[in-house]
Amino acid sequence: MIKHFNVSEGPRKAANRLRISRLTPVVLIVVLAGGGQVAAQSQVAAKAPTANVFQEQAGKLGVRRCANLFAALGNTVSNGAAYTVQTQTGGAAADGHGVQGVVGMTYNTPGYTAQAAGVVIAAPVGTKCEGQLVRVAPFQRACKDVVGQLPAGSTAAGSLSGVPLYNLGGGQGQAMLVSSGNSCVVVTIARGADVG
């Protein structure tokens, strides 16, 4: 059974005890996880009252241990977008399993106006939590033109089967630039962990 929660969210702040990177709008992200037994869904507007939808959904599903990391990763992946998120976790023992959020986003900014998708995952590892986020966004320009929009200090890290891979400046994760005709799909990946 899927529970639906409709909540509006505006600007968000990452939890201060978590170590994750801020990603610039051009840096966009995908992580795969097994299906959960419990789910929640929210519609979120980019310019509404501040709330933390990711933390709220995790709490409603019984996730306590990794709720802060999940929320910080979710806020990072959806930064600057209106979005809808569906959150899933593993049934009755939710706090002992990973929590996953699948995010559909719409950007309407001066530098990027399009749809994007993201996935955030946080899971207990020993006494702490670790997580990942991925955001995927298409750009209507060639990848060689998108490279200049990567964060300052970004460096080429080689290629994976011909797909360019970049280490993002400021320790913000990695980005793959996938050419698709005259367009470029940017896939950004970042990791996070509890630090306190």
Label every model-predicted segment.
Residues 43-124, 190-192:
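N-terminal secretory signal peptides
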Residues 110-162:
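Long, charged/polar, surface-exposed segments that mediate recognition or autoinhibition
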Residues 1-20:
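N-terminal secretory signal peptides that target proteins for export/translocation
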Residues 194-196:
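Short, solvent-exposed mixed-charge patches
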Residues 166-169, 173-183:
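Short, exposed beta-strand-loop hairpins at the edges of beta-sheets
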Residues 65-70, 131-133, 143, 147, ...:
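Short, structured motif recognition centered on aromatic/hydrophobic residues
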Residues 35-41:
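Sec/Tat signal peptide C-region and signal peptidase I cleavage site
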Residues 24-34:
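Bacterial N-terminal signal peptides
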